[in-house]
Swiss-Prot record:
PANTHER family from the UniProt entry: CASP-LIKE PROTEIN 1U1
The species this protein was found in: Populus trichocarpa (Western balsam poplar)
Protein name: CASP-like protein 1E1
Extracellular face residues: 52-86, 135-162
Subunit (UniProt): Homodimer and heterodimers.
Keyword set includes Ribosomal protein: no
A Pfam family it matches: CASP_dom
Amino acid sequence: MESQNKASLPVMDGLERRVVASQSEGASTCDLLLRVLALVLTLAAAIVLGVDKQTKVVPIKIVDTLPAINLPVSAKWHYLSAFTYSVASNAIACSYAALSLVLAVSGKKGIMSIVIVLDLLMVAMLFSSNGAALAIGLMGYQGNSHVRWTKVCHVFGRFCNQVAVSISLSLLGSILFLLLVGITSLRLHKKSK
C-alpha cells in the first residue's frame, strides 16, 4: 500500500507543477494584456489632449457705449499648466508601459519588485495629473463666480469635449496600472509562501 502511494507521488507532483506553471503563464498573459492596454490608453490620452486647440470669434465689449468687437480667441492645451502636466505624465506613463512590456517579455526574474514600485509611481503620477486636469476642466465648464472666472466651455465646446475624453482615457489607464500593482503584489505574495 505504501509503495503505491509513493509511486503515485511523482505523477501528482508533475501534474501540480504543470497546473502552477499554467496559472503563472495566465497571470503573465493578463499582465501583458493590461500593460498593452495601459500603453494604448495613455498614448491616446496624450495625443487627444496634445492636439487639442480651438479658435472661435468672440464678441468683446471694451466700453459699454461702443459696440462689441469680434476678435478671434484661441484655446490651446499648453495655455494651462494642468493640461501640460497631464500630457507629460501620460507620455511618461506610455513610455514606461512600453519599457515594462519589454521587461515583462524578457522574463527577468529579479525586476518584479522594481516594476511594482514603478507601476505604483505611474498610478500616483496619473491620478495627480488627472485631478489637476479635471479641476481646471471643471473651472472651464462651470466657472467660479467667487473669483469672477467665467465658464468657457459654452464657447469652446469641442476643446472641452477633447479634454473630457483625454481625462477619461487617462483615468482608465491609471486604473489599469492600479490593477497591475494589485496583480503583481498578489503574485509576489503567492511566491513568498
